Amino acid sequence: MKMADRSGKIIPGQAYIEVEYDYEYEAKDRKIVIKQGERYILVKKTNDDWWQVKPDENSKAFYVPAQYVKEVTRKALMPPVKQVAGLPNNSTKIMQSLHLQRSTENVNKLPELSSFGKPSSSVQGTGLTRDANQNFGPSYNPGHTVNLSLDLTHNNGKFNNDSHSPKVSSQNRTRLFGHFPGPEFLDVEKTSFSQEQSCDSAGEGSERIHQDSESGDELSSSSTEQIRATTPPNQGRPDSPVYANLQELKISQSALPPLPGSPAIQINGEWETHKDSSGRCYYYDRGTQERTWKPPRWTRDASISKGDFQSPGDQELLSSEENYYSTSYSQSDSQCGSPPRGWSEELDERGHTLYTSDYTNEKWLKHIDDQGRQYYYSADGSRSEWELPKYNASSQQQREIIKSRSLDRRLQEPIVLTKWRHSTIVLDTNDKESPTASKPCFPENESSPSSPKHQDTASSPKDQEKYGLLNVTKIAENGKKVRKNWLSSWAVLQGSSLLFTKTQGSSTSWFGSNQSKPEFTVDLKGATIEMASKDKSSKKNVFELKTRQGTELLIQSDNDTVINDWFKVLSSTINNQAVDTDEGIEEEILPDSPGIEKHDKEKEQKDPKKLRSFKVSSIDSSEQKKTKKNLKKFLTRRPTLQAVREKGYIKDQVFGSNLANLCQRENGTVPKFVKLCIEHVEEYGLDVDGIYRVSGNLAVIQKLRFAVNHDEKLDLNDSKWEDIHVITGALKMFFRELPEPLFTFNHFNDFVNAIKQEPRQRVAAVKDLIRQLPKPNQDTMQILFRHLKRVVENGEKNRMTYQSIAIVFGPTLLKPEKETGNIAVHTVYQNQIVELILLELSSIFGR
């Protein structure tokens, strides 16, 4: 079968593989042949040996050996190609070959640099760098080549007309390169023009530029020719970097930042942050006197030491192409790393930068191509641009956006994030809108985050919010202990509520997504917090949080700093909530001042119409105040769950309750549920095959258990409980979930020793032990065993024997307090004891 073409269309976000070696094999229905350089869509990594792929979306998938292919980086949507005027078809054939490729000739040869680390003024080149949004038109003929030579001499920003190199007229230049609409940028520092004039020299002194077919990238504005820089030996080094303005080619070059003339806005080590006359930020190294528009490494990774900074020598190894694009894009982006006006910035669940338009709610993503240049494409993949689109919004829309943004300018404590497989990162809340941006610059009229003004604002308890990944487990819910189950959850503190979600995409998280719902929420009003003791958890860095609702949590983190920060913030929030509640009650109790009453009376006399409406509103507000006051008093004075249970307002459940307490609550010696089940089975189930041995539907049994625990009116004749095995299953579950079995723990060994005695002595010994049990245990045991005796007596119909009943009920009614290694031996004794009681029922309990 024919395999995929390597130049096929690449779908954004799709995973691809590229064949490294030829391979073929016979499948069931076809022959699979793959060739080196071919690309396929990766469907599934089935195992370490075989991957499932397909040529395109509509083709049938097949398997390829994983060792013969490699996974290609996911391609994002590349910027669109813009057509420009091409070359006329009747032009002189002066181009023999023009292809795109990356230069590898002078990899190890560095260009001669000026005092600023720039190439000297005389440079050579064979290629032409296109603008980021430009491309050769359709009439461009790749079969032609041209050798140009220009002598670029620094002469007050102009070119020296006395150059000995051949001149290229504007007419020829237009004929060769076509018309380039819009501004065209050519980095002179990385452009070289060859001195050779021979059109027939196939490759000597000139660089062949061809499309890299193996890369799979089409000839578009996203790909850039690599142009090398060399210096003739007879040229000296100028005193300043070369900046040339090629008027006819519309070529411009960004200059270095100016020398600092004012105090630094920010200082971090040797690096200072300054602003130029236009208000744009730049960076200056006091030690090396290096100036750059691009933020140094310390703004992106605070953990990098000064020794990791790039020296001027290291900058020689950097591609001037990278410097060019970083400079040009810094102009289009906002000056201090924040998104452009009219756009808000956030991260999606995959960690990609996502921009949302404040006017149209349109979402765009930022990506970086193979050349290290960033561009933007719409979330639906329909458009791509080098810069975010600009929208003209009405003044009303702008006012609304400014108003909404002003509400989010609260400065808060740093957000502590824990990256997966990485250490904890402290992220300042000022970087919320641009998590990947550099350190922000602050205007002169605003304080930096380290200033006292900032700290006071950040420590405001009412605006306090915190996010992070924590390990959490419940140990009690509604006053009842639950089993510990440690989970890693994304915790969000917002106001007086602490929310826990499975993922980071919660509506309250700083990513702003609405895709996750909180697993559970904890109300911090009236809560208490303390470091957990060792008996609560053996883990380190654990604190215990108790709420008024009876919920108890254990919260843990392996990072000491993270857990200490959370403990401080939660303690502060709990204390502030208590203070706010007390102040609210006191304010409502205080009477109005006499001056206010006098002012109100004078106002009422002047305006009788407003008086009536004022009285109605005042009555409503007074009623609301009374209601709030009563509610606050109720909440602050509400008793604990344990106190309510002790007073008898909340009853314990039937399943899992102590037998003596349950009988005392029901004013009897046998639980009502046991009587109800036995009566129902004896009426409808004695002739059912395998009664008590056959299991019922566990889901229906749980529904029956729920109804019994909630004191619902129970009718076992209801069609919901028509399966007799559901009733017998619920009865067995009742005895299985007793905190202490029917044969109590302290008598287990005595019963085992009794069954080991001689047959004549066994009955008397067992009878004496049963009489030592509590009264509820004796009576419940008697009614149960008499019922089981009747079941065995109907064995011809239900095929149940003494031995089968003993196997079912032995481990349920009789078990040790702590299981040991003698489980098999104990099981034998348990079955023998139950079987003995059934056989000698009349001797033990009487007739």
Curated annotation (Swiss-Prot):
Q: Which GO terms describe its biological process?
A: actin filament organization; negative regulation of small GTPase mediated signal transduction; phagocytosis, engulfment; signal transduction
| Residue numbers spanned by region Disordered | 110-241, 293-317, 428-466, 591-625
Modification Phosphotyrosine occurs at = 243
Site note Arginine finger applies to 693
Pfam families tied to this protein:
PH, RhoGAP, SH3-WW_linker, SH3_1
Recorded hits in InterPro entries, A to Z, give: ARHGAP12_SH3, PH-like_dom_sf, PH_domain, Rho-GAP, Rho_GTPase_activation_prot, RhoGAP_dom, SH3-like_dom_sf, SH3_domain
GO CC annotation? cytoplasm; phagocytic cup
Q: Which UniProt keywords apply?
A: GTPase activation, Phosphoprotein, Repeat, SH3 domain
Q: Which residues carry this modification: Phosphothreonine?
A: 230-231
- Domain of life assignment: Eukaryota
Q: What protein name is recorded for this chain?
A: Rho GTPase-activating protein 12
Q: Where is the SH3 domain?
A: 12-74
Query: What's this chain's function?
Result: GTPase activator for the Rho-type GTPases by converting them to an inactive GDP-bound state.
Q: Which CDD domains match?
A: PH_ARHGAP9-like (cd13233), RhoGAP_ARHGAP27_15_12_9 (cd04403), SH3_ARHGAP12 (cd12070), WW (cd00201)
**Skewed-composition ranges (Basic and acidic residues):** 595-610
Stored SUPFAM superfamilies: GTPase activation domain, GAP, PH domain-like, SH3-domain, WW domain
Outline the extent of the PH domain: 463-575
